[in-house]
């Protein structure tokens, strides 16, 4: 797709860099694969804020995505679409055998007319889904399952991938984008390629309003709050907070390790991040 750079003809367009939508379908989403979605606004079932800085935003419809890829017959890519619920793009797949359709995450380079399939005899081509034991070492994959049959859980965001770096008995060694090397059962599925929209990380929204359209609310600095609201709050005049950076709940931030000790999945991690 590429980037879209704006000339500074208005204050809000100065420095704005967005994702170009050239090549994406302008049609409405497939009606049979769409249903309504109510925004939680960052609240849980008690109505309490559990995730700050969320709320508002444009109304969205949820697209049902096939993360399990259980069909072994060939499908043809009808079009590549924008999805407001995630950073990567979607591919609408049409199966001629029974005239059904499904959405999958579009890998980088996929275009209308491409053929995709899943199964042990699938070719090593972007968009094809295979068991990890059938994918060569060194391949880039996305949509990786953590447990066989549960559906994709790893490497689903724009530009994400994992690399197969080795095998260890019934496990495959997978290097994630964070640098972590993890053991995954070789009977788990993965899709070949890198998730589309690689430039998502380079976009600059340019104005507060565009964040609000996306459902992102303002983030207030702790030093600008009152003492009752944040450990960095209060003080006469402008202050630096007076202590090492912490969250509103007093937990150290900026470098503090957040992973729990003795986590049950530790035995599957060969190397930590970095």
Curated annotation (Swiss-Prot):
Keyword RNA-binding: yes
SMART domains per UniProt: Ribosomal_L2, Ribosomal_L2_C
Biased composition (Basic and acidic residues): 263-274
Gene Ontology CC terms: large ribosomal subunit
Keywords in alphabetical order: Ribonucleoprotein, Ribosomal protein, RNA-binding, rRNA-binding
GO terms (BP aspect): cytoplasmic translation
Record Gene3D superfamilies: 2.30.30.30, Nucleic acid-binding proteins (2.40.50.140), Ribosomal protein L2, domain 3 (4.10.950.10)
InterPro entries: NA-bd_OB-fold, Rib_uL2_dom2, Ribosomal_uL2, Ribosomal_uL2_bac/org-type, Ribosomal_uL2_C, Ribosomal_uL2_CS, Ribosomal_uL2_dom3, Ribosomal_uL2_RNA-bd_dom
A Pfam family: Ribosomal_L2_C
Biased composition regions of type Basic residues, renumbered to the chain: 45-55
Family: Belongs to the universal ribosomal protein uL2 family.
Primary role: One of the primary rRNA binding proteins. Required for association of the 30S and 50S subunits to form the 70S ribosome, for tRNA binding and peptide bond formation. It has been suggested to have peptidyltransferase activity; this is somewhat controversial. Makes several contacts with the 16S rRNA in the 70S ribosome.
Assembly mode: Part of the 50S ribosomal subunit. Forms a bridge to the 30S subunit in the 70S ribosome.
Classification via PANTHER family: LARGE RIBOSOMAL SUBUNIT PROTEIN UL2M, RIBOSOMAL PROTEIN L2
Name the record gives this protein: Large ribosomal subunit protein uL2
Organism this protein belongs to: Wolbachia pipientis subsp. Culex pipiens (strain wPip)
């Amino acid at each position: 797709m590429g980037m879209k750079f704006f000339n500074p003809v208005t204050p809000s367009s100065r420095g704005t860099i967005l994702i170009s939508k050239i090549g994406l379908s302008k049609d409405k989403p497939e009606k049979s694969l769409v249903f309504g979605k109510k925004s939680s606004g960052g609240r849980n079932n008690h109505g309490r804020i559990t995730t700050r800085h969320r709320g508002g935003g444009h109304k969205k419809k949820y697209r049902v995505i096939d993360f399990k890829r259980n069909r072994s017959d060939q499908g043809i890519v009808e079009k590549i679409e924008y999805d407001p619920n995630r950073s990567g793009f979607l591919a609408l797949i049409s199966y001629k055998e029974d005239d059904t359709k499904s959405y999958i995450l579009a890998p980088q380079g996929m275009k209308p007319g491409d053929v995709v399939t899943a199964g042990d005899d699938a070719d090593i081509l972007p968009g094809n889904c295979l068991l990890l034991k059938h994918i060569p070492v060194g391949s880039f994959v996305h949509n990786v399952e953590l447990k066989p049959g549960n559906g994709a859980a790893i490497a689903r965001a724009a530009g994400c991938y994992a690399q197969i770096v080795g095998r260890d008995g019934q496990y495959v060694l997978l290097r994630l984008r964070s640098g972590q090397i993890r053991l995954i059962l070789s009977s788990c599925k993965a899709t070949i390629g890198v998730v589309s929209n690689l430039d998502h990380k380079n976009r600059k929204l340019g104005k507060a309003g565009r964040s609000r359209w996306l459902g992102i609310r303002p983030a207030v600095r702790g030093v600008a709050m009152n003492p009752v609201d944040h450990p960095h709050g209060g003080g006469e005049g402008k202050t630096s907070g007076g202590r090492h950076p912490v969250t509103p709940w007093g937990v150290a931030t900026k470098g503090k390790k957040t992973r729990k000790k003795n986590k049950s999945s530790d035995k599957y991690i060969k190397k930590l991040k970095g």
